[in-house]
């Protein structure tokens, strides 16, 4: 059985997420390691109030993803492929040993600070479910303007598209999407316009910072956000990490590549279950699980080929990323 680790991005966070991670020595070690780097307890940043901050959200996501991945690897559940969505790509790079956790933490903090400073209010992300990419693109092209820009950001599934841009521009797109039959068209819990040209200055800043960071070639295959390519060199991974913030994410294509590389078990690191839902719904013949506290024994049994003891669960309805 070949395994892919999926690491989620902003929008999947929820209050208490770090307190609900696996009860495992590697998780505790990682939480303590991050706390030492921050000079404060990282567990304090998962309150409802703290998660209003983009910086806190992205640090929490990095921490949760790396901590859980380390716990699984300690239990001999080793990924052949890592795929991280948006800021989840930094956690994927740590799991693949391209970046140290310390460098990833500094980069994620810089990324979040620059994103917030560039667009503190009036912008964000929205999800449209039930329309195709070309349908959404046509609506976006009709609605966007220089003063109220909107862009197609992420292709999460053939009929699950994320848009980025100004609040007013996105409202026009969402209204039109509903009128054209979208089953869901709603704002996400993301207050910056990620994955579009508006954030090119952030990408440039990250590129400069990454040029001074010690990088290593990935220990397993890293699949990129921008072009959904399998990457096996540090330079390619670094380019994807820096530039995905200013480009659309081809998530569906990325997970399809993981399947084509032989992965038939997709494990989503906390928080949430959206990415594993997408895999179950859109990748025929694969199994997918969200690795949560109560699911760890099931995941370990399945990953170690004891499929006879697995009790199937119905797929969740995916909503946002």
Language-model segments: residues:
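FabD-like malonyl-/acyl-CoA
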Residues: 1-137, 265-298
């Amino acid at each position: 059985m070949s395994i892919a680790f999926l690491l989620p991005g902003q929008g999947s966070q929820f209050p208490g997420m770090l307190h609900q991670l696996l009860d495992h020595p590697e998780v505790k070690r990682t939480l303590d390691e991050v706390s030492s780097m921050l000079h404060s307890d990282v567990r304090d940043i998962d309150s409802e109030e703290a998660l209003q901050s983009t910086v806190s959200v992205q640090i929490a996501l990095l921490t949760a993803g790396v901590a859980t991945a380390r716990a699984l690897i300690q239990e001999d559940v080793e990924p052949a492929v890592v795929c991280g969505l948006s800021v989840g790509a930094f956690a994927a790079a740590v799991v693949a040993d391209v970046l140290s956790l310390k460098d990833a933490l500094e980069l994620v903090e810089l990324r979040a600070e620059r994103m917030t400073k560039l667009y503190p209010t009036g912008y964000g992300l929205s999800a449209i479910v039930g329309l195709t990419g070309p349908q959404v693109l046509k609506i976006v092209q009709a609605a966007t303007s220089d003063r109220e820009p909107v862009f197609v950001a992420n292709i999460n599934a053939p009929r699950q598209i994320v848009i980025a841009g100004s609040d007013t521009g996105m409202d026009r797109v969402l209204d039109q999407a509903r009128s054209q039959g979208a089953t869901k068209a709603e704002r996400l819990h993301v207050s910056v316009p990620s994955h579009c040209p508006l954030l090119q200055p952030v990408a440039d800043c990250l590129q400069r910072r990454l040029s001074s960071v010690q990088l290593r070639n990935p220990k397993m295959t890293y699949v990129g956000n921008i072009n959904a390519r399998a990457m096996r060199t540090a330079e390619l991974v670094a380019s994807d990490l820096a530039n995905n913030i200013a480009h659309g994410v081809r998530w569906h294509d990325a997970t399809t590549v993981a399947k084509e590389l032989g992965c038939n078990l997709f494990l989503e690191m906390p928080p949430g279950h959206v990415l594993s839902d997408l895999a179950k719904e859109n990748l025929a013949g694969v199994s997918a699980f969200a690795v949560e506290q109560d699911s760890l024994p099931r995941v370990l049994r399945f990953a170690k080929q004891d499929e006879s003891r697995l009790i199937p669960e119905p797929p969740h309805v995916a909503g946002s990323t």
